[in-house]
Amino acid sequence: MTTATQFLTDDHRDCDALWAEVERAADDAPAAELRAGFERFSAAMARHFDFEEAVLFPAFEAATGMTQGGPTFVMRSEHQQMRRVLDGMAAAMAAGERQALLDAGDTLLMLVQQHNVKEEHMLYPACDAHLGQGWGALQGRFPATR
């Protein structure tokens, strides 16, 4: 069984790779190709956030009793902040403003990097420790990817 740390860190890397594809496409790809790449990236980010918020975080909170003010509270807040940036990116995408998309993407990348360090080095290892074998059932609830 893959640990929560490995599984979710791998998903972070998958999201990073999808953003790199969008950045490359923003240079000179046809609008439809750029739009499709952005939609894949945006869907992957939403899938990751939704899984954590609906499945992982509640399980961690139940196992540890940590809720308000705990690590999942902070992670949810950061997800909301990143969702707002993603909304701005979607608006730039819809308006055909490639540079605005990339500029917002730079902001998102900074937020994601800071967020992922916290999850990968603190929260996910804590999930491994507190969820134990229960992680396998949770992992099975992760939506199919791409």
Located regions from the model:
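Small-residue-biased structural context
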Residues: 1-146
